[in-house]
Every structure is written in structure tokens, then in C-alpha cells.
Amino acid sequence: MRFPGATHRVITCKSVAEAKAAVDTARRILKQLGVELHPQKTRITHVQEGFEFLGYKIKRGQRQMHLPESMIRSQARQGALYAYPKEKSIRRFMDQVRQRTKRTLPLKTEELIPELNPLLRGWGEYYKRVHVRQLFNRLDRWILRRIWSHRFKRWRKAGWRWLPRRKLYGEYGLVRLAGLIPSLAF
């Protein structure tokens, strides 16, 4: 019996022995339910190496502290867990944006943006709660260049000055990925 998507789990343990015992226990319980663990997808790894899960890369990072060791009261950030989109997810998103902003598409900018917005909003909403501020800013700039490039190809005399950012985000309603991050609402 298969339950796609219903059995995605991450189990954290303090030691390798504890992790192996947890996998054995999970196998026994799932066998009673008529379900089995996928041998290629089930693995034990150290969080320092990181792992990929549901489109995210999760890893323990060593955050650079700008204060001397004596001034740091808490070591909570030294070994913090960081999650960010997988490279494959980012590439797939960029490919979808490329498909919708092809320079040969016979669309005006006002027609192109409503085609692009659902993709931007959906992808941005899924990843907005992890460490993506720099990534979203970079992707926002890249999307602007794609739109400007599309417009310039269609109308050679219309340079980027004729289509400023405030017009794209304001009048045309282009979704800004960085604006989806809760602490950065524009």
C-alpha cells in the first residue's frame, strides 16, 4: 500500500545509536500498518551535513559573530538550524519564469504580469518563512531584468527608463518576492 506525501517525516536524535533504534521502531510500527519505509529515501545523517526535505535544504550553520567571545551571553545562534530552498527548486522556478517571460511572446507588459504573478506569489508564499531574504532580493532583480528584456525586444525604443520599478510594482501590480516575507512587508 502506498501513501504518497503522507509519510514524509524527519526524526531527530542525539546519537547514531538512538537514530538506528528510532528507524527500527518506525519500521516495526509501519509494518503493522502495512506500510514500509523507502530504502533509498530513509537515511541517517548528521545535521551538520544537512539534508533535503520537501523542497528545502536544512543544515546547521555556523553564523559569523561580530562580537568578541567574552561579550556573547548565549550560544544559541552558534549552531542554529537554517532552512532554505533547494538549488533544484530555485532552478525549476527560474525555468518557469523564463517560460512565461520569453522575449518572443506576443504579450504587452500589462498582459505579461498577470500571467507571472500567480507563479511568483505561490512560490514566494511556500518559501517565505525560511532564510530567503537575499535570495528573494536577487530573484526580484532578475525578474525585473527579464521583464525589461521582454519589453525591449518587443519595442526597441522603449528602454528601461520608460518602465520604472514603481510603475511595475504599483500600476501593473507585479508581485515582489521580498514583499512576501512577513518582516519585510512593503
Tell me what each language-model feature is.
Residues 1-186:
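Non-catalytic terminal/accessory segments
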